[in-house]
């Protein structure tokens, strides 16, 4: 589920680097995106916490998409790239279109663009990241990171459905100083989704992470299976300001199996050894997972070897000398740099489907925080009845506006 053999280890020399995005694909640098996400965060301990989000495990229904996201999508000029079709684990395009062409630039065909993060600069810099969390083994991994004082040196690309079903694990990662990023809502092949479905997969995951992390807006995302093309890139960056993160080497830890013809812990560790104990000095951005005990075991075995061989371990943002979040600098306790206003908090009660709402209770609790993080004002609460679907609720958090987005697009 979490990988496929056509995306095995990528050689630097085999990867086709395409030109940077045409400027016309992206939203204007002075565009106001602050209205995309604005609302107070729900309490993850509350019994109705899950009702604030789409159901986990599948792509959110387009009816759940806030209108502000769709309005922003409508302003983004997208490249002329068709929606792909899943074909035995490899997305294919209609009319015999070549996924490696620069117009499409699918990473499935080992093509990436200049704006993608692929291999970190600097000698012996390991950009440490883990996909697919939080899972049952995540707390053990987070303990190991903390014991080795490297919690803040890891980026966790989290799945939205996992976030809302295991919010306490996310909070542990946040408290320890982990860097949080987006791995979509349900781990689909993104190039096979419509534009609106891509928006839903990314936006709701950003929403869930920001709600738990003090309004900090994720700045990075990694496509499941590495499945991204120029259409999906343009939506991610044009609508949400997200930077696409890929990898220069696949550890294949996701493929570990007891079957004799599959990868084993020993074989994955042997390949890992060639990366961190050999003569390589160029930076590493590996595909690794917090998926099960095997993936955690591989990392815990290889990390000491890397350190002993002079590797410097950093999270993705630090490895590329970039800030952690769209609206905050470095760390989970750094000041949120844009003005933030918590709007109406609406509790949705699902009825017969995961995307319809029969009734809602709205509690308004507005507050304003200045650039120094000082609370300026708060408003009283009120309750009222409503029958809004999720898509019509006020947005949930403040995303970085013009200057923040411009900074990452330079």
From Swiss-Prot:
Catalytic center residues: 131 (proton acceptor), 289 (proton donor)
Documented effect of changing residue 219 to L: In strain: CAP 67
Keywords linked to the UniProt accession: Carbohydrate metabolism, Cell membrane, Cell wall biogenesis/degradation, Chitin degradation, Chitin-binding, Cleavage on pair of basic residues, Cobalt, Glycoprotein, GPI-anchor, Hydrolase, Lipoprotein, Membrane, Metal-binding, Polysaccharide degradation, Signal
Pfam families for this protein: Polysacc_deac_1
GO cellular component terms listed in the entry, alphabetical order: plasma membrane; side of membrane
Keyword field contains Translocase: no
Protein's membrane topology: Lipid-anchor; GPI-anchor
Residues at which Co(2+) binds: 132, 183, 187
Signal peptide: 1-18
Glycosylation, residue list: 61, 80, 149, 279, 293
Lipid-anchored residues (GPI-anchor amidated serine): 385
E.C. numbers: 3.5.1.41
Named cofactor requirement(s): Co(2+)
Annotated positions binding acetate: 131, 225
Chain positions listed as propeptide in the UniProt record: 19-39, 386-410
Domain NodB homology: from-to ranges: 124-314
Subcellular localization: Cell membrane
GO BP: cell wall organization; chitin catabolic process; fungal-type cell wall biogenesis; polysaccharide catabolic process
Database matches in SUPFAM superfamilies: Glycoside hydrolase/deacetylase
Recorded GO MF terms: chitin binding; chitin deacetylase activity; metal ion binding
Reaction catalysis annotation: [(1->4)-N-acetyl-beta-D-glucosaminyl](n) + n H2O = chitosan + n acetate
Family that this chain belongs to: Belongs to the polysaccharide deacetylase family.
Job of this protein: Hydrolyzes the N-acetamido groups of N-acetyl-D-glucosamine residues in chitin to form chitosan and acetate. Chitosan is required to anchor melanin to the cell wall, for maintenance of cell wall integrity, and for proper cytokinesis. Chitosan offers an advantage during infection as it is less readily detected than chitin by host immunosurveillance mechanisms.
Name of the protein in question: Chitin deacetylase 3
Organism the protein comes from: Cryptococcus neoformans var. neoformans serotype D (strain JEC21 / ATCC MYA-565) (Filobasidiella neoformans)
Gene: CDA3
